[in-house]
Amino acid sequence: VHLLPSYDFGSVPERSEHQKTVDHAWLSSLPSNSPDQQAAVASIANDDAFNWGYDPVHYGVPEGSYATNPDGDARVLEFRTMVQGLAGLGLRTIVDVVYNHTLSAGPTDRNSVLDKVVPGYYHRRNFDGHYENSTCCNNTASENLMMERLIVDDLVHWAVSYKVDGFRFDLMGHLMLRTVVKARDAIKSLTVKRNGVDGSKIYLYGEGWDYAEVSGGRVGTNASQLNLGGTGIGSFNDRLREGVMGGSPFGDPRVQGVMTGLYFHPNNFMEQGGAEAQLKRVIEDSEKVIAAMAGNLREFEFTNKDGYPTPSRDACWVGSNVGYAAQPKETVNYVSAHDNETLFDGIMLRSAVDVPLDVRCRINRLAVATVAFSQGKHFSFTPFH
Protein backbone atom coordinates (compact mmCIF):
# COMPACT_ATOMS: atom_id res chain seq x y z
CA VAL A 1 0.00 0.00 0.00
CA HIS A 2 1.47 3.31 -1.11
CA LEU A 3 0.36 6.18 1.14
CA LEU A 4 0.38 9.73 -0.12
CA PRO A 5 2.37 12.09 2.15
CA SER A 6 1.59 11.33 5.78
CA TYR A 7 4.03 13.64 7.57
CA ASP A 8 2.84 16.96 9.01
CA PHE A 9 1.83 19.16 6.07
CA GLY A 10 0.41 22.65 6.12
CA SER A 11 -2.34 22.70 3.50
CA VAL A 12 -5.21 21.24 5.58
CA PRO A 13 -6.56 22.59 8.89
CA GLU A 14 -5.79 19.91 11.46
CA ARG A 15 -8.94 20.28 13.53
CA SER A 16 -12.14 19.12 11.83
CA GLU A 17 -14.12 22.07 13.19
CA HIS A 18 -11.84 24.40 11.21
CA GLN A 19 -12.37 22.52 7.93
CA LYS A 20 -14.97 23.79 5.51
CA THR A 21 -17.28 21.42 3.62
CA VAL A 22 -19.76 21.72 0.78
CA ASP A 23 -23.43 20.85 1.28
CA HIS A 24 -23.53 17.46 -0.44
CA ALA A 25 -27.33 17.38 -0.58
CA TRP A 26 -27.25 20.66 -2.51
CA LEU A 27 -24.51 19.34 -4.80
CA SER A 28 -26.52 16.23 -5.65
CA SER A 29 -29.53 18.37 -6.56
CA LEU A 30 -27.62 20.12 -9.35
CA PRO A 31 -27.68 18.96 -12.99
CA SER A 32 -24.74 16.72 -13.87
CA ASN A 33 -23.45 19.24 -16.42
CA SER A 34 -23.67 22.22 -14.08
CA PRO A 35 -20.50 24.28 -13.44
CA ASP A 36 -21.70 25.02 -9.90
CA GLN A 37 -20.28 21.83 -8.35
CA GLN A 38 -16.69 22.66 -9.26
CA ALA A 39 -17.17 26.32 -8.39
CA ALA A 40 -18.46 25.41 -4.93
CA VAL A 41 -15.60 23.01 -4.23
CA ALA A 42 -13.02 25.50 -5.54
CA SER A 43 -14.38 28.26 -3.30
CA ILE A 44 -13.37 26.36 -0.14
CA ALA A 45 -10.29 24.58 -1.52
CA ASN A 46 -7.90 26.38 0.82
CA ASP A 47 -9.85 25.36 3.91
CA ASP A 48 -11.31 21.93 3.19
CA ALA A 49 -9.93 18.55 4.27
CA PHE A 50 -8.71 17.45 0.84
CA ASN A 51 -5.08 17.76 -0.20
CA TRP A 52 -2.49 15.32 -1.49
CA GLY A 53 -0.11 16.61 1.17
CA TYR A 54 2.93 17.66 -0.86
CA ASP A 55 3.37 20.66 1.44
CA PRO A 56 5.83 19.56 4.15
CA VAL A 57 6.17 21.46 7.41
CA HIS A 58 7.53 18.89 9.92
CA TYR A 59 9.04 15.85 8.21
CA GLY A 60 9.26 13.55 11.22
CA VAL A 61 5.71 13.82 12.58
CA PRO A 62 2.49 12.18 11.26
CA GLU A 63 -0.15 14.54 9.88
CA GLY A 64 -2.64 15.66 12.52
CA SER A 65 -5.70 15.96 10.27
CA TYR A 66 -5.63 12.17 9.80
CA ALA A 67 -5.81 11.56 13.56
CA THR A 68 -8.91 11.44 15.74
CA ASN A 69 -7.28 14.19 17.80
CA PRO A 70 -4.43 16.28 16.36
CA ASP A 71 -3.24 17.22 19.85
CA GLY A 72 -1.13 14.93 21.99
CA ASP A 73 0.09 11.50 20.98
CA ALA A 74 -2.97 10.25 19.06
CA ARG A 75 -1.41 10.88 15.64
CA VAL A 76 1.65 8.83 16.59
CA LEU A 77 -0.23 5.90 18.12
CA GLU A 78 -2.84 5.77 15.37
CA PHE A 79 -0.27 5.81 12.57
CA ARG A 80 1.63 2.98 14.23
CA THR A 81 -1.63 1.06 14.71
CA MET A 82 -2.49 1.53 11.03
CA VAL A 83 0.88 0.16 9.86
CA GLN A 84 0.54 -2.74 12.29
CA GLY A 85 -2.97 -3.47 11.03
CA LEU A 86 -1.88 -3.46 7.38
CA ALA A 87 0.99 -5.78 8.24
CA GLY A 88 -1.49 -8.11 9.94
CA LEU A 89 -3.36 -8.31 6.63
CA GLY A 90 -0.15 -9.23 4.84
CA LEU A 91 0.25 -5.77 3.31
CA ARG A 92 3.41 -3.68 3.35
CA THR A 93 3.28 0.09 3.85
CA ILE A 94 5.20 2.53 1.68
CA VAL A 95 5.16 6.23 2.53
CA ASP A 96 5.60 9.09 0.10
CA VAL A 97 8.42 11.40 1.24
CA VAL A 98 8.91 14.94 -0.07
CA TYR A 99 12.39 16.11 0.85
CA ASN A 100 12.87 18.22 -2.29
CA HIS A 101 10.99 21.27 -1.00
CA THR A 102 9.14 22.75 1.95
CA LEU A 103 5.79 24.50 2.00
CA SER A 104 7.29 27.73 3.32
CA ALA A 105 10.61 29.45 3.88
CA GLY A 106 11.91 32.70 5.30
CA PRO A 107 12.06 34.10 8.83
CA THR A 108 8.41 35.07 9.35
CA ASP A 109 6.04 32.53 7.77
CA ARG A 110 4.33 30.40 10.46
CA ASN A 111 4.95 27.23 8.41
CA SER A 112 8.63 27.97 7.87
CA VAL A 113 10.85 25.75 10.00
CA LEU A 114 14.29 25.20 8.49
CA ASP A 115 14.96 28.84 7.63
CA LYS A 116 14.34 29.71 11.27
CA VAL A 117 16.96 27.19 12.36
CA VAL A 118 19.75 28.35 10.04
CA PRO A 119 18.56 31.09 7.66
CA GLY A 120 19.52 30.48 4.04
CA TYR A 121 21.23 27.12 4.61
CA TYR A 122 18.67 24.38 4.02
CA HIS A 123 17.25 25.77 0.77
CA ARG A 124 18.79 26.00 -2.69
CA ARG A 125 19.18 29.50 -4.05
CA ASN A 126 20.00 30.83 -7.50
CA PHE A 127 22.77 33.28 -8.32
CA ASP A 128 20.47 36.20 -7.48
CA GLY A 129 19.88 34.82 -4.00
CA HIS A 130 16.26 33.83 -4.62
CA TYR A 131 14.88 30.41 -3.70
CA GLU A 132 14.85 27.89 -6.51
CA ASN A 133 11.23 26.90 -7.15
CA SER A 134 11.45 24.25 -9.89
CA THR A 135 9.85 21.59 -7.66
CA CYS A 136 6.96 23.97 -7.01
CA CYS A 137 8.39 26.07 -4.17
CA ASN A 138 11.31 26.48 -1.77
CA ASN A 139 13.65 23.80 -3.14
CA THR A 140 15.82 22.21 -0.47
CA ALA A 141 19.57 21.74 -0.88
CA SER A 142 20.60 18.16 -0.09
CA GLU A 143 24.07 19.02 -1.40
CA ASN A 144 24.49 20.79 1.95
CA LEU A 145 25.68 18.42 4.66
CA MET A 146 23.05 19.05 7.33
CA MET A 147 20.12 18.96 4.90
CA GLU A 148 21.45 15.60 3.83
CA ARG A 149 21.77 14.56 7.47
CA LEU A 150 18.17 15.60 8.12
CA ILE A 151 16.92 13.43 5.24
CA VAL A 152 18.92 10.36 6.24
CA ASP A 153 18.04 10.63 9.94
CA ASP A 154 14.35 11.19 9.20
CA LEU A 155 14.12 8.12 6.95
CA VAL A 156 15.71 5.98 9.66
CA HIS A 157 13.26 7.49 12.16
CA TRP A 158 10.24 6.45 10.06
CA ALA A 159 11.67 2.99 9.50
CA VAL A 160 12.43 2.35 13.18
CA SER A 161 9.64 4.25 14.94
CA TYR A 162 6.78 3.53 12.55
CA LYS A 163 7.93 0.25 10.96
CA VAL A 164 7.17 1.34 7.39
CA ASP A 165 8.36 -0.99 4.64
CA GLY A 166 9.47 1.41 1.95
CA PHE A 167 9.87 4.99 0.80
CA ARG A 168 8.74 6.64 -2.42
CA PHE A 169 10.74 9.84 -3.08
CA ASP A 170 8.87 12.69 -4.69
CA LEU A 171 11.08 14.36 -7.34
CA MET A 172 14.04 12.25 -6.26
CA GLY A 173 16.13 13.72 -9.08
CA HIS A 174 16.26 16.99 -7.14
CA LEU A 175 18.18 15.21 -4.37
CA MET A 176 21.85 14.36 -4.65
CA LEU A 177 22.68 10.74 -5.48
CA ARG A 178 25.10 10.74 -2.55
CA THR A 179 22.21 11.59 -0.20
CA VAL A 180 19.93 8.81 -1.40
CA VAL A 181 22.77 6.26 -1.32
CA LYS A 182 23.63 7.28 2.26
CA ALA A 183 19.97 6.83 3.17
CA ARG A 184 19.97 3.40 1.55
CA ASP A 185 23.07 2.37 3.48
CA ALA A 186 21.70 3.68 6.79
CA ILE A 187 18.43 1.81 6.31
CA LYS A 188 20.08 -1.41 5.13
CA SER A 189 22.21 -1.41 8.31
CA LEU A 190 19.10 -1.71 10.52
CA THR A 191 18.63 -5.12 12.14
CA VAL A 192 15.82 -6.75 14.07
CA LYS A 193 18.08 -7.44 17.04
CA ARG A 194 19.46 -3.92 17.32
CA ASN A 195 16.65 -1.75 15.87
CA GLY A 196 13.55 -3.93 15.73
CA VAL A 197 13.58 -3.64 11.93
CA ASP A 198 15.10 -5.65 9.09
CA GLY A 199 16.43 -2.85 6.90
CA SER A 200 17.37 -5.25 4.11
CA LYS A 201 13.65 -5.64 3.31
CA ILE A 202 12.95 -1.91 2.98
CA TYR A 203 12.63 -0.67 -0.61
CA LEU A 204 13.55 2.80 -1.85
CA TYR A 205 12.30 4.24 -5.12
CA GLY A 206 11.21 7.55 -6.57
CA GLU A 207 10.81 9.99 -9.41
CA GLY A 208 14.20 10.17 -11.09
CA TRP A 209 13.43 13.12 -13.33
CA ASP A 210 16.40 15.23 -14.40
CA TYR A 211 15.37 18.83 -15.03
CA ALA A 212 15.75 22.48 -14.03
CA GLU A 213 18.72 23.66 -11.99
CA VAL A 214 19.91 20.13 -11.10
CA SER A 215 19.86 18.77 -14.67
CA GLY A 216 23.07 17.50 -16.20
CA GLY A 217 24.87 17.46 -12.85
CA ARG A 218 24.98 21.25 -12.55
CA VAL A 219 24.59 21.14 -8.76
CA GLY A 220 26.21 17.72 -8.33
CA THR A 221 25.49 14.13 -9.31
CA ASN A 222 21.77 13.86 -8.69
CA ALA A 223 19.54 10.85 -8.07
CA SER A 224 18.14 10.82 -11.60
CA GLN A 225 17.35 7.78 -13.74
CA LEU A 226 20.65 7.57 -15.62
CA ASN A 227 22.68 7.88 -12.40
CA LEU A 228 20.86 5.19 -10.38
CA GLY A 229 22.07 2.06 -12.16
CA GLY A 230 23.78 -0.28 -9.73
CA THR A 231 22.45 1.37 -6.57
CA GLY A 232 19.48 -0.95 -6.04
CA ILE A 233 17.26 2.14 -5.78
CA GLY A 234 14.23 2.14 -8.08
CA SER A 235 12.88 4.85 -10.33
CA PHE A 236 9.65 5.23 -12.26
CA ASN A 237 10.04 4.02 -15.85
CA ASP A 238 8.22 6.58 -17.97
CA ARG A 239 9.48 4.82 -21.11
CA LEU A 240 6.87 2.08 -20.64
CA ARG A 241 4.04 4.48 -19.89
CA GLU A 242 4.75 6.62 -22.94
CA GLY A 243 5.36 3.64 -25.22
CA VAL A 244 2.08 1.99 -24.26
CA MET A 245 -0.10 5.08 -23.96
CA GLY A 246 1.65 7.67 -26.15
CA GLY A 247 2.54 11.30 -25.56
CA SER A 248 3.83 12.65 -22.27
CA PRO A 249 2.31 14.08 -19.07
CA PHE A 250 2.92 17.61 -20.28
CA GLY A 251 1.75 17.22 -23.88
CA ASP A 252 -1.60 16.71 -25.53
CA PRO A 253 -3.31 13.77 -23.75
CA ARG A 254 -4.73 12.54 -27.06
CA VAL A 255 -1.37 11.56 -28.58
CA GLN A 256 -1.51 7.81 -29.22
CA GLY A 257 0.93 4.99 -28.45
CA VAL A 258 1.34 1.30 -29.25
CA MET A 259 -1.84 0.17 -27.48
CA THR A 260 -4.05 3.21 -27.98
CA GLY A 261 -4.21 3.10 -31.77
CA LEU A 262 -1.12 4.80 -33.20
CA TYR A 263 -0.74 3.83 -36.89
CA PHE A 264 -3.16 0.88 -36.62
CA HIS A 265 -6.27 2.84 -35.61
CA PRO A 266 -5.37 6.54 -35.50
CA ASN A 267 -7.78 9.06 -34.07
CA ASN A 268 -8.64 12.24 -35.92
CA PHE A 269 -8.53 14.52 -32.89
CA MET A 270 -5.16 16.00 -33.80
CA GLU A 271 -2.37 15.90 -36.36
CA GLN A 272 -0.03 12.96 -35.64
CA GLY A 273 1.71 12.81 -39.02
CA GLY A 274 1.12 10.53 -41.98
CA ALA A 275 1.21 6.74 -42.05
CA GLU A 276 4.98 6.59 -42.54
CA ALA A 277 5.69 8.90 -39.61
CA GLN A 278 3.25 7.00 -37.39
CA LEU A 279 4.78 3.65 -38.34
CA LYS A 280 8.22 4.95 -37.37
CA ARG A 281 6.89 6.12 -34.01
CA VAL A 282 4.97 2.93 -33.27
CA ILE A 283 8.13 0.88 -33.89
CA GLU A 284 10.14 3.15 -31.58
CA ASP A 285 7.40 2.94 -28.95
CA SER A 286 7.41 -0.86 -29.29
CA GLU A 287 11.13 -0.89 -28.52
CA LYS A 288 10.44 1.02 -25.29
CA VAL A 289 7.85 -1.59 -24.30
CA ILE A 290 10.21 -4.48 -25.14
CA ALA A 291 13.00 -2.97 -23.05
CA ALA A 292 10.67 -2.19 -20.14
CA MET A 293 9.28 -5.71 -19.99
CA ALA A 294 12.86 -6.95 -19.69
CA GLY A 295 13.38 -4.74 -16.64
CA ASN A 296 14.66 -1.76 -18.62
CA LEU A 297 18.14 -3.25 -18.22
CA ARG A 298 20.75 -1.23 -20.06
CA GLU A 299 22.60 -4.38 -21.23
CA PHE A 300 19.49 -6.17 -22.51
CA GLU A 301 19.70 -6.71 -26.28
CA PHE A 302 16.79 -6.80 -28.71
CA THR A 303 16.55 -6.75 -32.50
CA ASN A 304 15.88 -3.19 -33.62
CA LYS A 305 13.79 -2.01 -36.56
CA ASP A 306 16.79 -2.37 -38.89
CA GLY A 307 17.33 -6.01 -37.91
CA TYR A 308 20.42 -5.45 -35.77
CA PRO A 309 20.96 -6.45 -32.11
CA THR A 310 20.81 -3.31 -30.00
CA PRO A 311 21.53 -2.90 -26.28
CA SER A 312 18.66 -1.19 -24.52
CA ARG A 313 21.03 1.55 -23.38
CA ASP A 314 21.63 2.56 -27.03
CA ALA A 315 17.97 2.89 -27.94
CA CYS A 316 17.07 6.56 -27.97
CA TRP A 317 14.24 8.20 -26.10
CA VAL A 318 13.79 11.98 -26.25
CA GLY A 319 17.53 12.53 -26.48
CA SER A 320 18.26 10.10 -23.64
CA ASN A 321 18.65 6.33 -23.22
CA VAL A 322 15.79 3.85 -23.02
CA GLY A 323 17.58 1.35 -20.78
CA TYR A 324 19.34 2.59 -17.65
CA ALA A 325 18.91 -0.08 -14.95
CA ALA A 326 21.61 -2.53 -13.86
CA GLN A 327 19.12 -4.86 -12.14
CA PRO A 328 15.34 -5.26 -12.48
CA LYS A 329 14.50 -3.87 -9.03
CA GLU A 330 15.83 -0.49 -10.16
CA THR A 331 12.89 -0.21 -12.58
CA VAL A 332 9.36 0.64 -11.43
CA ASN A 333 7.09 -0.11 -14.38
CA TYR A 334 3.73 1.66 -14.65
CA VAL A 335 1.23 2.95 -17.18
CA SER A 336 -0.70 5.38 -14.95
CA ALA A 337 -0.20 7.18 -11.65
CA HIS A 338 -1.93 9.78 -9.50
CA ASP A 339 -0.41 12.74 -11.38
CA ASN A 340 -2.49 12.34 -14.53
CA GLU A 341 -5.60 10.64 -15.90
CA THR A 342 -6.46 7.14 -14.74
CA LEU A 343 -5.48 4.43 -17.20
CA PHE A 344 -8.99 3.98 -18.57
CA ASP A 345 -9.59 7.72 -18.87
CA GLY A 346 -6.31 7.99 -20.80
CA ILE A 347 -7.47 5.24 -23.15
CA MET A 348 -10.83 6.97 -23.62
CA LEU A 349 -9.09 10.24 -24.53
CA ARG A 350 -6.81 8.60 -27.10
CA SER A 351 -9.02 6.00 -28.76
CA ALA A 352 -10.62 6.77 -32.10
CA VAL A 353 -14.34 7.55 -31.93
CA ASP A 354 -15.36 4.28 -33.59
CA VAL A 355 -13.50 2.04 -31.11
CA PRO A 356 -16.25 0.20 -29.16
CA LEU A 357 -16.30 0.09 -25.38
CA ASP A 358 -15.46 -3.61 -25.12
CA VAL A 359 -12.30 -3.04 -27.20
CA ARG A 360 -11.31 -0.14 -24.95
CA CYS A 361 -11.68 -2.47 -21.97
CA ARG A 362 -9.43 -5.01 -23.70
CA ILE A 363 -6.86 -2.26 -24.32
CA ASN A 364 -7.00 -1.48 -20.60
CA ARG A 365 -6.32 -5.12 -19.69
CA LEU A 366 -3.48 -5.38 -22.20
CA ALA A 367 -1.86 -2.19 -20.90
CA VAL A 368 -2.02 -3.52 -17.33
CA ALA A 369 -0.53 -6.81 -18.56
CA THR A 370 2.63 -5.04 -19.76
CA VAL A 371 3.21 -4.03 -16.14
CA ALA A 372 2.11 -7.30 -14.55
CA PHE A 373 4.28 -9.48 -16.78
CA SER A 374 7.37 -7.27 -16.86
CA GLN A 375 10.54 -7.70 -14.85
CA GLY A 376 11.12 -5.15 -12.13
CA LYS A 377 8.75 -3.57 -9.64
CA HIS A 378 5.10 -3.22 -10.60
CA PHE A 379 3.26 0.01 -9.80
CA SER A 380 -0.53 -0.09 -10.10
CA PHE A 381 -2.63 3.00 -9.42
CA THR A 382 -5.84 2.15 -7.55
CA PRO A 383 -6.95 5.08 -5.37
CA PHE A 384 -8.70 4.37 -2.07
CA HIS A 385 -10.88 6.94 -0.33
Where are the model-predicted features located?
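Active-site-proximal helices and loops of the catalytic beta/alpha 8
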Residues: S16-Q19, D36, L171-A325, R360-C361, ...
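Substrate-binding/active-site clefts of carbohydrate-active enzymes
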Residues: L4-Y162, M176-G196, S200, V214-S215, ...
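Catalytic domains of carbohydrate-active enzymes, especially glycoside hydrolases
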Residues: V1-Y7, A45-D47, A367-H378
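Hydrophobic faces of well-ordered beta-strands that scaffold small-molecule active sites
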Residues: V1, T93-V95, F167, L204-G206, ...
